[in-house]
Amino acid sequence: GASGGPVGMINVDLVENIDFYAGAFPAARGNALSSVMEFSFKEARTDEWTANMVVGTSDLGLTLEGPTGEKSSLIMSMRRSYLQLLFEAIGLPFLPIYNDYQFKWTARPDDRNAITVIGLGALDNFELNLGIAQDSAQDNYLDQVAILGALDIQRQWNYTQGVKWDRYQDNGKWTFVASRNMLNNRAFKHLDNDEENPLIRDYLSQEIENKFRAERKLFLKEGMEATYGVLYEYAKYNNSTSEKRLNPATGALESVAFQSDFKAHKYGAFVQANRRLMQERLTVSAGMRIDGSTAASGLVNPLKQWSPRVSASFAFAPGWTFNANAGMYSQLPAYTILGYAVGDARVNATDSTSYLNNRQLVAGLKWDGSEKNFVVSVEGFFKGYQNSPISSLQGVALANLGADFGVVGNEAVTFDGLGRSYGAELLLQQRLYKGFYGLLAYTFVRSEFEDSSGEFVPSSWDNRHILSMTGGKKFENGWEIGTRLLFSGGLPYTPTDAGSYSIESWDFYGRPLLDYSLLNSERNGAFHQLDIRIDKKWFFERWSLDVFMEVQNATGAAVPQPNFSDVVRNPLTGAPVPSQTQPGFYDQRQIDPSNGAILPALGIIIEL
């Protein structure tokens, strides 16, 4: 998939700090194009064991933390959803089921050494609620049949495990990191959603990476710091695909079936230096990174993927700072792209295969009113993308295929696409002050990629206007109220292809296909959502109780989106009815997918 679901696999209660880099990425953090988000998990308490239990309307959660010895501690979290029960009760056609775990173990045998072991993983299943399409007397019977006919069943699990050793020295430290991560992704569909029928789509892929990084950080004289290091990764990928695809040039369905696997070495090196000048009013930083991989012959030479970056921060007046950065960044093509095969040949792994590139420039002002914990910043940015993968079949950038769930990149591509994004962001932050806190962020952005004719068109992420306001008030006696207001401009979308309503195409796909000659030529309306949450906490001698009530989408606003195109169906059986006026085709009908449901929730949190 190209975007996450409503619940992240990282439990935010275990997060101590998040560093977000919209530019000026640290040279030690590679394989990123547009931004980097670095999570730091909190260390467990070392005095006693405690427990935190959460019971909400969508999931159960348990967090434990405490000492595992005189110089070590452990914090771990487990969550299990029952959101599928709620979705089934209100008659939704899909039933998401998720489970996840997370832990961090820390040992400090002496003042010079620290060892950290981190792990997280998730098991996600996406079921179809076939029971809602059994009663033809229901008002929305035909709509449910249509949606169930278009959805795949998905199975996914993944994990990441790693160990880090920090060796502290008088002038800095050494850091050694070894880790392993794996993703298993399955998507399939039976004809008419009947397991007795053959599979019409069957996709299974696995990504496995074993990583090592050695990093040296030095504190030098005169306010100067330096970081350098090397990295190595051993990756394995396999893919089994069986499906049919519509060829837009011929209008015919073509079979695609292959099995592919490869192993690859990835390697790189980095260096970065920072220095504070002018009585620490000016901070400058410069870095360089190179990366290479044996996944394709065009990726082997690391000197082709050199990524310089430079940044500066100047405090020109009390509370005021000017920041600017520029850089070139590289990212390896997705394994799904590199693993696509025709026969025995991986057609996207050739001399012409290249890393994706981004050249960006960011500059802005920041004012920090520390007396009242208030911060204001404004920033402008430009990012230019090169070597973006272009679908050989559809002639569009894969970046324009990624605004929904599904498999992206499992096809032949060329690496000659261009894209760009530019805009500005305003941020106002009120840290806790007299019980109040809040954050307001407004972003104006234009995001564009080339279409098949070489013209820039809006990308699938081109919201243009995004406004987010989060705030709250802490009262005495354990009461707290929080709100979040989100406003987002409408996303562009591509209309459906008239040829996908042919009997041959619809009987196979069960859904309309898109007309990429009209790529993102339509746009949805703007969207807003208001969430409200109220907490009441009671503190006892050895435990505390938090009862919360929240309402998501309190105003009942519907998400604007294009109608779901279906075909005329038999009202008793749900079967498509051939057109009486256009032989070989079905007639169209439209389903309004807008859903403005108000979602109340009630839960408790117990800390022991």
What is the predicted function of each stretch?
Residues 386-387, 391, 438, 478, ...:
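C-terminal beta-signal and adjacent terminal beta-strands/loops
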